[in-house]
Amino acid sequence: MTGEPSLCIRGCGFFSTSQTKNLCSKCYNDFLKDESARYLATFNVNTKAAEEVTAQEATVLGSKGGCACKKKVGLLGFHCRCGHLFFASHRYPEEHSCPSDYKSAAIDVLAKQNPVVKGDKLFRL
């Protein structure tokens, strides 16, 4: 402990400690309430944003039946590049009438990942 007690930094006239950020007990409790209110306000904003995103996903996906057969997929569904859901019997693009061109996309990816490397020709003597 230090020799001389310090007063509250908010000027209320009560004594404070360094453990309570140089605030008296009343001011420190008020400070904690304000901090928790700020935290809850940011938490509520984040949850509202997350709820909006899930609501948008729900409207896009509907009843989780992303194909023409209207079968409910549940947790077994996968998202296709076109945005539809498909499962084991629809795992081929032709089965769920996917407009995405997988072959040309795969060829482009392979061309970028594996560039053609040619060395200089050596002249024979």
Swiss-Prot record:
GO terms for molecular function: DNA binding; zinc ion binding. The keyword Zinc-finger applies. Zn(2+) 1 binds at residues 8, 12, 24, 27. It comes from the Eukaryota. Zn(2+) 2 binds at residues 80, 82, 96, 98. Gene3D superfamilies: 1.20.5.4770, AN1-like Zinc finger. A zinc finger (AN1-type) spans 61-106. This is Putative zinc finger A20 and AN1 domain-containing stress-associated protein 8. It comes from Arabidopsis thaliana. The lineage of its organism: Eukaryota, Viridiplantae, Streptophyta, Embryophyta, Tracheophyta. The gene is SAP8.
